[in-house]
Curated annotation (Swiss-Prot):
Organism (species): Serratia proteamaculans (strain 568)
Protein name, UniProt field: Dihydroorotate dehydrogenase (quinone)
Essential cofactor(s): FMN
Keywords attached to this entry: Cell membrane, Flavoprotein, FMN, Membrane, Oxidoreductase, Pyrimidine biosynthesis
Gene Ontology terms, MF aspect: dihydroorotate dehydrogenase (quinone) activity
GO biological-process terms attached to the record: 'de novo' pyrimidine nucleobase biosynthetic process; 'de novo' UMP biosynthetic process
EC number of the protein: 1.3.5.2
InterPro entries xrefs: Aldolase_TIM (IPR013785), DHO_dehydrogenase (IPR050074), Dihydroorotate_DH_1_2 (IPR012135), Dihydroorotate_DH_2 (IPR005719), Dihydroorotate_DH_cat (IPR005720), Dihydroorotate_DH_CS (IPR001295)
Keyword presence, Flavoprotein: yes
Involved pathway(s): Pyrimidine metabolism; UMP biosynthesis via de novo pathway; orotate from (S)-dihydroorotate (quinone route): step 1/1
Length: 336
């Protein structure tokens, strides 16, 4: 592919402008004879996870295609599954710009996007138009102006709307960019949320005559005790899977680099080791009682294999994909 040249041009632009431009072009070629420019053939390597059959174990992590605008394009590149979102009940513009920064020397990104999205109804319309043959995950969150105490209502609204169209639903309680959101990972707040989500899942299962698994996405910045408590809650509430991890607030690996002081969540290579360690600790705690989807800094075949060796059943990429391009999908799926 021509990605090194494309990347050079895109990296001259503001990161958010580069993202918009890329999505414009992907929408332009998808479903036309020009789709060959992005299509890659990858081997089928089926994986069974959460009761679903995945074509291969590599997925696109949430956050890149928040509104489900380019699902078919990412499918054409060879992803076994695509996770869209995070989406909220109502549209919201997110935090003030600039809010996305490349840490080029470290192959990392810092973002404080703040769940900018066009709302769950718009996402559902985009999903209905897509023809992706893989598993579609839909990642849901709460609106910024919804008080944390009422946050679970936002998740239940989104579940209602996405359930008929989702392969699985991801519950995002770990973004550092929505005030108070991470507090939902702890103690009674977590138990209350998970109980409500399982009740809603049961209700929707009966209504739609299909079972859509639910996975919870957690942060990397957790103490041993917090991780043990989260694992215990996930098991007690019969949650179907856990996605580990979201972005980190830790900056120790990027000290002195451009933009290192910017607020927001850090992803990419600087997150690689810490997210793998969370997966390893989580796997020891869970003992196979629910599967782990590993994400955080995967930028090579070896990084993907490390996540799986630590206990992940599936893996996802985002920042590594920005820095390495579609070839990374092929490299991982071919040899994982």
């Amino acid at each position: 592919m021509y990605y090194p040249l494309i990347r050079k041009a895109l990296f001259q632009l503001d990161p958010e402008r580069a993202h918009e431009l890329t999505f414009q072009q992907l929408r332009r070629v998808t479903g036309t004879p020009l789709e060959f420019l992005i299509r890659q053939s990858v081997p089928t390597k089926p994986v069974s996870c959460m009761g679903l059959s995945f074509k291969n174990p590599l997925g696109l992590a949430a956050g890149l295609d928040k509104d489900g605008e380019c699902i078919d394009a990412f499918g054409a590149m060879g992803f076994g599954f695509v996770e869209v979102g995070t989406v909220t009940p109502r549209p919201q513009s997110g935090n003030d710009k600039p809010r996305l920064f490349r840490i080029v020397e470290a192959e990392g990104l810092i973002n404080r996007m703040g769940f900018n999205n066009q709302g769950v109804d718009n996402l559902v319309e985009n999903v209905k138009k897509s023809h992706f043959g893989g598993i579609l995950g839909i990642n849901i969150g709460k609106n910024k102006d919804t008080p944390v105490e009422q946050g679970k209502d936002d998740y239940l609204i989104c579940m209602d709307k996405v359930y008929p169209y989702a392969g699985y639903i991801a519950i995002n309680i770990s973004s550092p960019n929505t005030p108070g959101l991470r507090s939902l990972q702890y103690g009674e707040a977590l138990d209350d949320l998970l109980a409500a989500i399982k009740n809603k899942q049961q209700e929707l299962h009966e209504r739609h005559h299909k079972y859509v698994p639910v996975a919870v996405k957690i942060a990397p910045d957790l103490s041993e005790e917090e991780l043990i408590q989260i694992a215990d809650s996930l098991v007690r509430h019969n949650i179907d899977g856990v996605i580990a991890t979201n972005t980190t607030l830790d900056r120790k690996l990027i000290q002195g680099l451009n933009y290192c002081e910017q607020m927001g969540g850090l992803s990419g290579r600087p997150l690689q080791a810490s997210s793998t360690e969370v997966i390893r600790r989580l796997s020891l705690e869970l003992q196979g009682r629910l599967p782990i989807i590993g994400v955080g800094g995967i930028d090579s075949l070896m990084a993907a294999r490390e996540k799986m060796a630590a206990g992940a059943s599936l893996v996802q990429i985002y920042s590594g994909f920005i820095f390495k391009g579609p070839r990374l999908i092929k490299d991982i799926v071919n040899y994982i």
